UniProtKB/Swiss-Prot annotation:
Keywords: Cytoplasm, Metal-binding, Zinc. Belongs to the SprT family. This is Protein SprT-like. GO terms for molecular function: zinc ion binding. It is found in: Cytoplasm. It comes from Enterococcus faecalis (strain ATCC 700802 / V583).
Length: 153
């Protein structure tokens, strides 16, 4: 999808769902990493993350567009346009926009180091490696031995 196609889609959604025209500029912004879109308060322009369209398709992009248009129209009307405001929540629910952007970056799985006490057999999981010559078991003060790296979700 090009910026021009995005502009026409935003204008169409604005007329159909909000019954008001979108008079500013809507573009894709590849620098957005974790958000689906952004509304600029000063210029009233909208930026959208192209990853939403590429990863989830046009249906999810339309939900993000509705979300940003809620900010846009409420701000221009002088009403509460922030996420916490009642006006915003009501308009978002009425138009069917997304409350949150879908996950755009995959989270790294946590890796833990597994240690075991040589005396009592207590298993200890740590995110950071520890020096087994300096640290001992907290339960019985026995020596620790490194077992393996474990991935946890």
């Amino acid at each position: 999808m090009t910026d021009q196609a995005l502009q026409t889609l935003v204008e169409k959604i604005s007329i159909v769902f909000f019954q008001k025209p979108f008079l500013h500029q809507a573009t894709f912004n590849r620098r957005l990493k974790t958000t689906g879109g952004r509304y600029h308060l000063a210029s009233h322009h909208l930026d959208f993350n192209p990853t939403v369209f590429l990863k989830y398709g046009q249906e999810e992009l339309e939900k993000v567009i509705k979300h940003e248009l809620c900010h846009y129209h409420l701000h221009l009307a002088g009403k509460g346009y922030q996420h916490k405001d009642k006006d915003f929540k009501e308009l978002l629910a009425k138009t069917g926009g997304a409350r949150y952007a879908p996950p755009l970056v995959e989270r790294k799985k946590a890796v833990f180091h597994q240690y075991q006490c040589q005396s009592c057999g207590e298993v200890i999981l740590r995110k950071r490696r520890i020096d087994t010559t300096r640290y001992v078991c907290g339960k019985c003060h026995g020596r620790l031995s490194w077992q393996a790296k474990k991935e946890q979700i």
